[in-house]
């Protein structure tokens, strides 16, 4: 069946925290172009965007300053590539059945995003 791609990082206790591939937009880059680049940089998979999954918008504190962050999420389909962690920040990458994605995700905001996204099999 259809699968979803997650990246994993090991925490201090050795547990794997699974999350959606993500990264920062570079100067002059669209959110879509950044997403395609980050997926390939983190996982080795070349993909194409099939639809937007929405935006997570939030504030957090860092070094005593309030930081505003906007995260764009997209649904992809795989084009080519060999699945393997490509950068040091990613410890492991793996495919999961689509109906397991939400429960595998370590972060509540990503779980909510997937829950709101409807049928991931539909472009």
Question: Could you describe each region identified by the protein language model?
Answer:
Residues 1-20:
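N-terminal strand-loop-strand
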Residues 9, 44, 115-116:
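A ubiquitous, low-specificity "background" feature that marks scattered single residues
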Residues 25-112:
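Unchanged
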Residues 112-120:
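A small-molecule sensor/coupling module
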Residues 123:
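Catalytic cores of nucleic-acid ligases and guanylyltransferases
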